[in-house]
């Protein structure tokens, strides 16, 4: 799966993690010194509203730093372990990381836009709203109406500019990822078909090379991008949520704690991930077994097309009974998994509002800041809840991975897993 596309996968991914850690440490520890050396001014911390968010000195320095680090890493691997797919696997992966991070920064730019826009909405409504139903509506001067209208239209135009950029980045990223994943599938297909004599005796070998590599590619296309997006969202929005925590002084039941929004999102997400991992622990094995009983039933039918002695009704009845039994077990396990998952997700919809009740009641934040907090908390929580949101897909990927692992074992002349050993 990985050897066909990545050079020396085990060492490669270890080096990716280690190199990323070193580069991140240098960036967060010495970016001001690096920026000063290159002539960039990183002293301004005020958020820029609009497309200028992506052209600040901080961003320009990041672009230079990222591509320099990526180029150095790729150059070393091109020299150390030349691989036919290295341009796609190394530089392609780096491009996906960058485009995903840029897409997340588009969300940050929109979140920065929320404060002035919704604060302006709040001010406009406050200017004209009567204090009680008995009072007449307050007449707002025409000059004020014109001024606020122009400001709102200006902010809407800024939002449209950011939105068009978001659409462009999304389309480019998805287009590239589709090609990236198909190249990966091509590499797997070439690798497995070249070893056909060694894997042909594994149950459902043809299905595994055709269907399972296809399913692996399809799942990785969605799951891979989502996990990268989750990690990049954390990098982008954790500082935002950390900064917004200064507007929230205390939490219900807990009281005053440092950085309450950050702590609450972390605890709530870990709880949800742990809950779903526990209730869904049996699902990968059941999905894998489901593929096996379906393959056995299909294989007998295929044999019956050429051999009148095969695919007899009693045999087919027994094989389909296995299919039915496994599906019913799968349905039962998914039932209580979905109960736990939906309970958690419904509670998640109002969790942040519960946290903010003391702050809202005290009038400690404006409507614009509230919108920023809701967005940042949602982004961070959803990233921490990656397993919660993707568990069903992860289960499907694990079942495909188990099936393709049989090919890896056969190619390496290792004993097959007991579940895959066929009587000869």
Predicted feature residues:
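Primarily ABC-family ATPase nucleotide-binding module
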Residues: 42, 48, 210, 310, ...
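Short cytosolic helices in intracellular loops of multi-pass membrane proteins
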Residues: 183-202, 281-322, 381-388, 397-407
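An intracellular "coupling" helix at the cytosolic face of ABC transporter transmembrane type-1 domains
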Residues: 215, 289-299, 303-351, 393-396, ...
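Hydrophobic alpha-helical transmembrane segments of ABC transporter permease domains
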Residues: 145-157, 161, 213-263, 348, ...
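Juxtamembrane "helix exit" motif at the C-terminal ends of alpha-helical transmembrane segments
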Residues: 22-39, 74-79, 106-130, 165-166, ...
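Transmembrane-helix motif of ABC transporter permease domains
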Residues: 10-19, 54-75, 83-106, 128-181, ...
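Juxtamembrane/interface segments at transmembrane-helix termini
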Residues: 30-39, 78-89, 110-115, 171-186, ...
């Amino acid at each position: 799966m990985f050897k066909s596309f990545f050079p020396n996968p085990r060492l490669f991914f270890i080096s990716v993690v280690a190199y990323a850690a070193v580069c991140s440490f240098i960036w967060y520890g010495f970016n001001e010194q690096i920026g000063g050396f290159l002539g960039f001014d990183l002293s301004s911390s005020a958020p820029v509203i609009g497309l200028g968010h992506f052209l600040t000195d901080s961003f320009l320095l990041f672009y230079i730093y990222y591509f320099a680090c990526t180029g150095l890493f790729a150059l070393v691997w091109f020299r150390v372990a030349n691989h036919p797919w290295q341009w796609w696997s190394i530089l392609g992966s780096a491009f996906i990381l960058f485009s995903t991070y840029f897409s997340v920064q588009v969300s940050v730019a929109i979140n920065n836009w929320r404060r002035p826009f919704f604060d302006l909405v709040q001010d406009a409504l406050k200017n004209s709203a009567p204090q009680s139903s008995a009072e007449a509506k307050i007449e707002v001067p025409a000059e004020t109406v014109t001024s606020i209208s122009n400001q709102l239209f200006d902010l809407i135009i800024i939002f449209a500019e950011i939105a068009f950029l978001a659409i462009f980045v999304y389309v480019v990223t998805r287009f590239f990822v589709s090609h990236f994943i198909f190249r990966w599938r091509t590499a797997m297909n070439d690798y497995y078909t070249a070893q056909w004599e060694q894997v042909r005796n594994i149950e459902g070998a043809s299905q595994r090379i055709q269907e399972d590599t296809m399913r692996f590619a399809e799942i990785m296309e969605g799951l891979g991008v989502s996990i990268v997006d989750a990690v990049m969202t954390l990098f982008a929005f954790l500082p935002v949520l950390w900064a917004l925590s200064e507007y929230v002084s205390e939490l219900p039941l807990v009281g005053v704690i440092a950085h309450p929004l950050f702590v609450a999102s972390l605890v709530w997400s870990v709880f949800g991930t742990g809950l779903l991992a526990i209730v869904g622990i049996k699902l990968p094995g059941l999905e894998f077994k489901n593929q096996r009983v379906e393959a056995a039933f299909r294989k007998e039918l295929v044999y019956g097309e050429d051999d009148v002695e095969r695919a007899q009704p009693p045999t087919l009845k027994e094989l389909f009974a296995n299919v039915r039994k496994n599906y019913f077990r799968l349905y039962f396990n998914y039932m209580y998994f979905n109960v736990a998952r939906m309970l958690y997700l419904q509670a998640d919809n109002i969790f942040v509002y519960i946290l903010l009740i003391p702050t809202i009641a005290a009038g400690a934040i404006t409507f614009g800041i509230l919108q920023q907090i809701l967005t940042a908390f949602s982004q961070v929580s959803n990233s921490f809840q990656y397993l919660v949101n993707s568990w069903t897909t992860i289960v499907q990927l694990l079942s495909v991975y188990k099936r393709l692992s049989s090919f890896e074992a056969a190619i390496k002349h290792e004993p097959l897993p007991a579940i895959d050993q066929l009587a000869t």
